[in-house]
Each structure stands twice: as C-alpha cells, then as structure tokens.
From Swiss-Prot:
GO terms for cellular component: cytosol. NCBIfam families: rbfA (TIGR00082). One of its GO terms (molecular function) is ribosomal small subunit binding. InterPro entries: KH_dom-like_a/b (IPR015946), RbfA (IPR000238), RbfA_dom_sf (IPR023799), Ribosome-bd_factorA_CS (IPR020053). It comes from Neisseria meningitidis serogroup A / serotype 4A (strain DSM 15465 / Z2491). Belongs to the RbfA family. It comes from the Bacteria. It is found in: Cytoplasm. Monomer. Binds 30S ribosomal subunits, but not 50S ribosomal subunits or 70S ribosomes. This is Ribosome-binding factor A.
Length: 123
C-alpha cells in the first residue's frame, strides 16, 4: 500500500506564508508612487520551491501596466525581503502575473444579467 504524499500540505503552508508576506511587503515596502493599490490574490509555487507565480490585481485598471513595471523592477528587492522573513532553503524566483479572473467573473455576471433582462417573463 502506498503512503499518501505529505509534500502538498507543506507546499500549501509555504505558499500561504509567501502570499501573506508578499501582500504585506507590497503594501508597505514599495516606495514607488506609481504603484497603485495592489492586492495579492494567489501564489503558486513549484514543487522544488524555485519559482513562485504571484497573481495580483490593482484597484485602478488604468495603472495596470505601470504596476506591472513597478513589480518587475522591485522583484529582486521583494525576494530579498522575503528571504529575511521566511526561513526556506531556497527562496523562489518571483514571477508576477495580473489576475484576470475577477474581470472575467464581472463580465460573465454582466452577460448573465443582460440575458436575464432580455428574456421575456413567462407566467
């Protein structure tokens, strides 16, 4: 009988800790005034902890590209600050990706509302 893999529980804890720490670092550690209000929504970590994809959203959609530049510019600083806060053998390389799921959800909701409004009411 195979033993259940226990690595996923640790991986989940690590990614949750990375997400919490990065959210705090982005909120307090980014000194660039061009950075808008950034929310860290999710972090995905590879099994060997060498890479972490950070999914984020911004309050002001017009600042999306500028925010991406700010995060890319601050990537090394954020990683070194993360290394001070988290005790891991290997601190993952950070990759930032805009989280479009919120926009897709809002668009889908608007489409559903539109179809519901156009549908004739049946008795």
């Amino acid at each position: 009988m195979r033993k259940p893999q226990r690595g996923y529980a640790r991986q989940d804890r690590v990614k949750e800790q990375i997400m919490r720490e990065l959210a705090e670092l982005v909120r307090t550690g980014l000194k660039d005034p061009r950075a808008g209000f950034i929310t860290v929504n999710e972090v995905e970590v590879t099994r060997d902890y060498s890479h972490a994809t950070v999914f984020y959203t911004v309050l002001n959609q017009d600042a999306r590209e500028i925010t991406e530049e700010v995060l890319e510019h601050a990537r090394g600083h954020l990683r070194s600050e993360l290394a001070k806060r988290i005790k891991l053998f290997k601190i993952p390389e950070l990759h930032f990706k805009y989280d479009e799921s919120l926009e897709r959800g809002l668009n889908l909701s608007a489409l559903i509302d539109q179809v519901a409004a156009e549908k004739p009411v049946e008795d």
